[in-house]
């Protein structure tokens, strides 16, 4: 959590509240970290942290989007901003797929 907060601070993203969600509660077996937070402007964020050695492809982006839909449905709450932090290479089709769906993608997460 500390590493993520430091990374968010380098991007000038500051949060009042940042809670970790368990992916298994939403039917996912993916090795992904999920956080929900409220920034200083009272915007609700849904943050996915995905780290892998292999390339992040369009199939992965679809799975992440489906997982976010399940979270939104179970929480009964929509998030204004959805973000994805990736440490692996990103496929251009996956990037455009996420941008069309108005996701913020940060590909420089370490």
Label each region the model flagged.
Residues 1-34:
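Acidic-basic catalytic patches of nuclease active cores, encompassing PD-(D/E)XK
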Residues 23-27, 33-71:
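Conserved catalytic cores of phosphodiester-cleaving nucleases, focusing on short active-site segments
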Residues 7, 15, 44, 48, ...:
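Phenylalanine-focused residue identity feature
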Residues 77-110:
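Short, compact, well-ordered microdomains
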Residues 9, 19-22, 41-43, 60, ...:
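Detector for Asparagine
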